[in-house]
UniProtKB/Swiss-Prot annotation:
Keyword Cell wall biogenesis/degradation on entry: no
Membrane topology per record: Multi-pass membrane protein
Annotated localization: Plastid, Chloroplast thylakoid membrane
Key words, A-Z: Chloroplast, Membrane, Photosynthesis, Plastid, Thylakoid, Transmembrane, Transmembrane helix
The name this protein goes by in its record: Photosystem I assembly protein Ycf4
Main location: plastid
Gene this protein is translated from: ycf4
Single GO biological process annotation from the record: photosynthesis
Amino acid sequence: MNWRSEHIWIELLKGSRKRGNFFWACILFLGSLGFLAVGASSYLGKNMISLLPSQQILFFPQGVVMSFYGIAGLFISSYLWCTILWNVGSGYDRFDRKEGIVCIFRWGFPGIKRRIFLQFLVRDIQSIRIQVKEGLYPRRILYMEIRGQGVIPLTRTDEKFFTPREIEQKAAELAYFLGVPIEVF
């Protein structure tokens, strides 16, 4: 969701609460439970899963490996669920022409620096940059170059769903709003 007026442009960012992250966290969790159940049933010698008789899988080495994969998958799945719960990467970009201030806010991982808040003046913005990489894994990222601070990404680096036209239009609108040039690299 975005909000725009004559002097203020606010762009809300979704973060890690995306449908794809929910899907992969569920798949990984269920698959890990399956691996762990197969490993446990081979250790106990009891048939915990009706599809696969436990007599066919020996505990050493197959059951140990299945248990290891199950535990590793549960750790990775818990990491995904934590990033979804904490909504890592969400936040907003606020461009205020009237006050001459740009604010960038993102939620990070819990800790001392959970809230990432950057604030600088509009006059310190040198340009809006577009990075385009075509090929098997195309990437189109929008950056803001700030005097003395380098470049700051405005779009997520994993968002490859922007068409060239969409990223150019977004860059042109933002550059016009802020009164800065566009660079492509």
